[in-house]
Amino acid sequence: MSDDYDPTAVAFKPGDMETDMNTGEPLALEAEAAAKDPAHNEESGEDTNANVESGTLVHQGDEPESIDKEDKVEDGPDTKSDGGVLDEPKDGEQRDDEKKEEHKPENPSEEVAEDDDYVPAAVSEPVEEDSAGGGSVGGTGIPDGAISSLAASTTIPPPSDPNQVGGGASSTSNNNNSGPDNNKRKRLATDTIGILEDRIAANPRDMPAWLDLISTIVRKEKLDESRDIYERFLALYPLSAEIWIEYITLEMDNGEFKRLEQLFGRCLTRLPNLKLWNIYLTYVRRVNVLSSESDKITEARTNIIKAFEFYLDHVGIDRESGNVWFEYLDFIKSKPATTTWEEQQKNDLTRKIYRKAIGIPLNNLSILWTAYTNFEYSLNKATARKFINEKSGSCQNARQCQTVLENLMRGLDRSSVPKSGPRDEFQVRAWKKWIDWEKSNPLGTDNKAETNKRLLYCLKQAVMSLQFVPEIWFLAAEYCFDDPLLKTEALQFLKDGLSLNPNSSLLAFRLAEYYEREADAEKMRTIYDEHIESLGKERQALIEAQGDPEAEPTAEIIKLNTQISIAYSVCMKAVKRFEGIKPGRMVFKKARNTGFATYHIYVASALMEFHHNKNPTVATNVFELGLKYCGSNAAYVQHYLDFLISLHDDTNARALFEKTIPLLGPSDAASLIKSMIKFESDFGEITSVVKLQDRLRQLNPDTSPITIIADRFATSDFDVIRQCDMLQKPKSRTDEDSDSERPSKRARRTSHGNDQGDKMEPFNLPQKIDALLRQLPNSSDYGEATFDPQRLVDLFRDVRIPDGLL
């Protein structure tokens, strides 16, 4: 393909539209957008920490010594414990030099994010101008020479409403029908658009509401409003190929070819969607007329050939693209050759296309192979066998891969509109299987670039289909991190995934860890702050949905409290590693001041202090501070108890036990007593063991004596009493830890929605039938199952066996 080809510049010349020399944007479109929204470039500030720090759990004076007396922590000798019973921490004390320091909390909204506008990996690179005129536009893979509007389309333009910029779940749609005041009034039943806008404002991930709103507005046949709703949706979910197709079709139906080319430039190279690319190819062939009356037939044919090459280079590896390979071959063959040289050139190009196609696992590979052999024999029978033998091996391998790929993709949902609601575990497993298969290099090629190309194609398909599944984004990034050549793509997967899933701790922690390894403290802190801010917004929304601020928190709110506290804990440890103990303590202080910190932040801070200089005093003070607010939490008490035992501080361990037991419920108290029985049995007195066993039986009279004694003498890997005296089988650790184990039949029946088999009793097959089945090849020989196992089970269950076979 020549370097001066622009697949979207096939209908108009660069002079057809005036553009801004700085931005490359069409001036007419910029003026139109500015007329619609005069406030488009206004910025609004917001305190991003306000929603997280809305309440206070402790006063500023309630500081542990880890913050109040930092010099003592680092010096060590001044903070030695006297070894006596625990004292209450001295709250309110603060060094003079500490008071002079003024802590300025971070405000992520004041920092310039790396990617203000969400742009997927394929077009995230800036437009580079080559003084020589060569190169490509914006790193999109579209060669230079495009119309000026395309050069400015490598990023998604901001929507008409500035409040919609930023993407992700935290963005909400705002227009005349969905303002905060209008949401409070009751909508009329006929106000369909207003009702849908309210649903979207309440939940930006309400995909049925989005699709209904788009359909309703487009049916009004008002072009500007239709464009606005498409831009709003695609600003939030730019990987939705089906919506891009609708948008492009709208512009095509209205003859807006210049806008159409801009849309192609924004989405084509980043979305490996065959239907979208087919529309592009149809458009190119539509505007390049191959008429004998045309004086530009040679130029038109060249444009179409380059468009075919562009298409096949990006999505030609898709198994469903076989028809386009045939279309390209037919187009090449249709050109009349006037000289022997032209005929030879046409045959060489045709052979090149055939030989490239038959090495790809396409759905019509057998037909392609037959056509190729006929083509070679029609040219020269003497050389045909040589050419055919050279490619027969790769074609046979591609056929086998095509069979496996067909089984892998059976039942796979490749639509790219985000799916709201619970995740589909079947789809997640199916995509993982395809990704793993592509990573294994099934074609056996030595070309690393081709292997990476197929893997990236599969990964992009997966994240398009499962946009709200952070696990898939994470796996895509990790697969790319394994190859140094794909480091840029890996980082982009993390950024794009976190943009769509801002509440994902998996993606936030992994991306922050990446920046920590790159020694970029600012970006690392920004990731943590924005993640905590997003979680805080969701928590605040749930509290407001409750209606009563004094009501008991729901399970979802409690879960968010824990998630936010753990996020603070992870951030605190990272900051301590990168910047030192004092900045880490400030993160701990910020977490406590949220008003809903769970015990996790206290445990993390205490252990961080202890491992900083191995002095237990500050750590003990932090544990004691947490005891004021988490003393009725058995898990926290257990952590504190384990810490004291690790210090060989038996006196304070027993004191803590007696102090907290009255605060716990029966179940939690029993768990703590069992832990203390184990401790006394290992390191204490037998009289203490007997007393604790009596307390346990008083608390829970149904407790079996043999259970108590079995727990005392069990080790981490062997339960001597249960396994030797009671003959109980040990619990297999492989059943818990293995991710590759074969799921049970019951689990498979449940995953397919069939529970009828749960009541079936196992039965033995007749000997002759069993012998026949044993002669069949092992299922692993096929790579993937070629039949539905549930239907096979149903067949065995319902089959009538003739008496002669029994």
Swiss-Prot record:
Pfam family of the protein (one): Suf
Primary localisation category: nucleus
HAT repeats: 221-253, 255-286, 299-334, 345-378, 404-440
Gene: RNA14
A single GO BP: mRNA 3'-end processing
GO cellular component: cytoplasm; nucleus
Keyword Chaperone: no
UniProt name for this protein: mRNA 3'-end-processing protein RNA14
Biased composition (Gly residues): 132-142
Bias (Basic and acidic residues) ranges: 33-43, 60-107, 732-744
Chain intervals for the UniProt region annotation (Disordered): 1-187, 729-770
Alphabetical keyword list: Cytoplasm, mRNA processing, Nucleus, Repeat
Entries under Gene3D superfamilies matching the protein: 1.25.40.1040
InterPro entries attached to this UniProt entry: HAT, Rna14-like, Suf, TPR-like_helical_dom_sf
Subcellular compartments: Nucleus; Cytoplasm
